[in-house]
Amino acid sequence: MVNPTTQPTSAAPARDGASPRPLRGMAPSPARARSAAERSAEAAQGLSIVVPLHNEAASIARLHARLVEVARTLGANRALACEVVYVDDGSGDDTLAVARALPATTLDVQVVSLSRNFGKEAALLAGLDHARFGAVLFIDGDGQHPTAMIETLVGHWLDGGYDVVFTAKAHRANESLTRRLAVKMFYALVNWGARTKIPEDASDFRLLSPRAADAVRNLPERNRFFKGLSSWIGFRQIRIDYQPEERADGRTTWNLRSLIGLSIDGLTAFSVAPLRIATMLGLLLALTAFIYGGQIVFETLVYGERVPGYPSLFVGVMVLGGVQLIMLGVVGEYIGKILYEIKGRPVYFVAEHALKPREEAKQTESDNRTAAE
C-alpha cells in the first residue's frame, strides 16, 4: 500500500508474452489512468536511463552493449528517444575512463563524475537531476538487473498508464537464512506503524513517469531513501517480479558493513519505528520495575523477608544502563539526521560532466542537411 488513496498493483512475472496478473490480496489502484493523448505526449519526452557506478570498470561495457540494443528496440517499436546517464560515485578503478569511451550509437550518453564517493542514494539523485528526458529508469551498473525487462517496464508505463513500475525479487531461495531473516526484519520494522508501506523485496530497478520523476526530484530532504520516496509519492504503481542475473564481471562492492549502514540510513530516513519501540520498551521496563518494587515491599511488610539486594541491584542497573545506551544511540541517529538537514549541504558535487549525442541522430541531421543543399 502506498497511501490510503493509491495502492500499487502487484503482478506476477509474465510468461510467454502474457501480461502480469494482479496477486491476491492486492487491490488495483483507484488513481485515474492517464489518457492515450497524455501517454503519447509523455513518450515524446523520451526516456533517461540512470546507472549509478562504483568500481564497475569490468562490467560497464557489457551493460552498455545491452542498453544500446534496448534503445534500438524502443526506438524502432515505440519511436522512443533514449539516453543513458552514467554516474560515477567516486570509483577507485577505471570506471570513469571506461564510461568516457562508451559509444553513443543508438542513445545519448551522459557521464557524470561525482567529486568523491557520496553513496548510492546521492548517485541516484545526481542521475535524476541530470536526466534530460521525461521518464527515468534506474538500473544498477553490475549487470544483475535484466535489461530484457526494460521494454516490459516501458510497456506498463505507456500502455498501462502506470507512473511507478518497480521490480522486486521473486524469491530469495539462493540467499542464506540469516540474510533472508535480516531482510524480513528490516521491512517489518520500516513498515511497522507506517502510513506508507514500502513493498517488500523491492529493488532500485524501476521506471518513473515524467510526473513521478518530477515529484521525487523536487522532494527537499537530503537524507534520501529512494525506495521509500518513490513509494511515498503515490500515483499508480505496479510491481513486477524478477530474478537477478549472475554477476558476469568483477565482484560486488557491497559488504556486511555497507549493507548495515544502508539499512540504518533507510530506516532513520523513512521511519520513526525505532523511536516508538524505545518508548514502548521504556514503558515496559518502568512497569516491570514498578511490579518488582511492589513485590519487594509486600514481602518485606507481610513476611518480614529481606530480599537479597546486591545481585538483583547489579543486574537491574546493567540491564537499564544497556537499554538506555541503546536508546540513546537510536535518538542520536535521528539527531544526526536533523543536524545534516539543518546544515543544508548539497547532497553531492559534480567533478566532471560530459554529454555525447547519439551517432544516429547526427547522421540523420547530416543526411537532411545534404538533401536540403
Regions flagged by a language model, labelled:
Residues 2-16, 20-175:
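Structured catalytic core of nucleotide-sugar glycosyltransferases
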Residues 2-16, 20-44, 225-373:
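Hydrophobic helical membrane-anchoring modules
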Residues 62-65, 69, 97, 184-187, ...:
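Generic recognition of well-ordered alpha-helical segments
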Residues 110-116, 120-130, 144-229, 245-264:
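Acceptor/aglycone-binding surface of glycosyltransferases and processive sugar-polymer synthases
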Residues 69, 73, 101, 105, ...:
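Conserved amphipathic alpha-helical interaction elements at protein-protein interfaces in regulatory
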Residues 55-58, 144, 217, 221, ...:
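Residues in soluble alpha-helical coiled-coils and helical-bundle/repeat scaffolds
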